UniProtKB/Swiss-Prot annotation:
Pathway: Mycotoxin biosynthesis. Its EC number is 1.1.1.85. This is 3-isopropylmalate dehydrogenase gloI. SMART domains: Iso_dh. It catalyses: (2R,3S)-3-isopropylmalate + NAD(+) = 4-methyl-2-oxopentanoate + CO2 + NADH. GO terms for biological process: L-leucine biosynthetic process. Pneumocandin B0 is the starting molecule for the first semisynthetic echinocandin antifungal drug, caspofungin acetate. Pneumocandin B0 is a minor fermentation product, and its industrial production was achieved by a combination of extensive mutation and medium optimization. Inactivation of three of gloP/GLP450-1, gloO/GLP450-2, and gloM/GLOXY1 generates 13 different pneumocandin analogs that lack one, two, three, or four hydroxyl groups on 4R,5R-dihydroxy-ornithine and 3S,4S-dihydroxy-homotyrosine of the parent hexapeptide. Mg(2+) binds at residues 228, 253, 257. Keywords: Amino-acid biosynthesis, Branched-chain amino acid biosynthesis, Leucine biosynthesis, Magnesium, Manganese, Metal-binding, NAD, NADP, Oxidoreductase. NADP(+) binds at residues 294-300, 307. Homodimer. Binds 1 Mg(2+) or Mn(2+) ion per subunit. It comes from Glarea lozoyensis (strain ATCC 20868 / MF5171). The record marks 194 as: Critical for catalysis.
């Protein structure tokens, strides 16, 4: 019996539709291989500026409801200079989507999908070679969602409240623990905080994380590190943080962007924002939002040169975490690595391939990989 998965697709703005086309191309190759077992029902919606132009809102209620009913969400990129003057920031469509789905746990891998990419890194090869980090960022709490007092026009004072509750920290810690347990041998977890000075994303965070790992993941090696020390280590010795990094919303926002410089291009990196904790990673379905970490690239959109790797690898993450197809995810990752090692690259990583050329090459490599399995 064929299993149907409903997937909501938000191509997004500027370069978003370009990379999304390559991601869907790869997803269709998986569907053809497994046509007797699975079917992907794709439902397209607008988000961000594209939605604002048509619906006068960054995301419609219909799009939100369809996303909530779907198995997973794929997203290209949101925003751009065309909509700088809108009454409501068009980027808020993504925030509303995350909130509506309660996407609490952001996962960002930081590694080299192809070993030769170490030569493209902003860092020295001997510093970053062997880096393999997965960052788990809590997405729904912290200072971004706390009470806010804007300045009164005199620019004398303003405030933002950093607030966390126990439940928000617990589920982020559990997600990190499950990720660590899913690998053999189990991965170490480094929790980042500011426990020497701050209450919420400091001492409360550290105390709750410590308790969760002591009671639920006693075999996982847990260490705590101050965020400023971690930021230094990302630049100086990133391999010392190999494994899982767990941290709060704002700290995760900053440290993940810093770490994204390691592989050499923002176009290489995927992300997942999960809405639940899998019972067993790689074997359970969890609704999530899957998107590359790069922006909409308005400066190069329409030229056919954007790197679609992050989007394609986001499709792989969707197959792994939301559709319970880990072998297919592994095959996509292997195909991407082979294509890059065979020197089919977009310009941001030293090649001349177009966006579509790269996607086509991945599909060919993927078919060969799937035929061997």
């Amino acid at each position: 019996m064929t299993k149907q998965f409903d997937i909501v697709v938000f191509p997004g703005d500027y370069g978003g539709p370009e990379v999304m086309a390559e991601g869907i191309k790869v997803l269709k190759a998986i569907e053809r291989k497994h046509q007797s077992d699975v079917s992907f029902n794709l439902k397209y919606h607008l988000i961000g500026g594209a939605s604002f132009d048509i619906h006068d809102t960054p995301i419609t209620t219909e799009a939100l409801e369809d996303a909530k009913a779907a198995s997973a969400v794929l997203l290209g990129a949101v925003g751009g200079p065309k909509w700088d003057g809108t009454p409501v920031p068009v980027e808020s469509g993504l925030g509303r989507l995350r909130k509506f789905l309660d996407a609490f746990g952001n996962i960002r891998p930081v590694n080299f999908i192809a070993p030769s990419l170490v030569n493209c890194s902003s860092f020295k090869e001997h510093v970053v070679s062997g880096t393999d980090i997965t960052i788990v960022r809590e997405l729904t709490g912290g200072i971004y969602f706390g009470a806010r007092q804007e300045h009164d026009g005199s620019f004398n004072s303003a405030s933002d409240l950093d607030h966390y509750d126990r439940d928000s920290i617990v589920r982020a810690a559990r997600l990190a623990g499950k990720l660590a347990m899913s690998r053999q041998p189990h991965l170490p977890v480094t929790s980042l905080d500011k426990a020497n000075l701050l209450a919420a994303c400091g001492r409360l965070w550290r105390g709750v994380v410590k308790e969760v790992f002591e009671t639920e993941f006693p075999t996982i090696k847990l260490s705590h590190m101050l965020i400023d020390t971690a930021a230094m280590n990302v630049a100086r010795r990133p391999t010392s943080l190999n494994g899982i990094i767990l941290t709060s919303n704002m700290f995760g926002d900053i440290i993940s962007d810093e770490a994204s410089a390691i592989p050499g291009s923002l176009g290489l990196l995927p992300s997942a924002s999960l809405c639940a904790i899998p019972t067993v990673l790689d074997a359970s379905k969890v609704r999530g939002i899957y998107e590359p970490i790069h922006g909409s690239a308005p400066d190069i959109a329409g030229q056919g040169i954007i790197n679609p790797t992050g989007m394609i690898l986001s499709v792989a993450m969707m197959l792994r975490y939301s559709l319970a197809m880990p072998e297919a995810a592994d095959s996509i990752e292997a195909a991407v690595g082979k294509v890059i090692e065979d020197d089919c690259r977009t310009s941001d990583i030293g090649g001349r391939a177009s966006t579509a050329d790269f996607g086509d090459a991945v599909v060919i490599a993927l078919r060969n990989c799937l035929d061997k399995n």
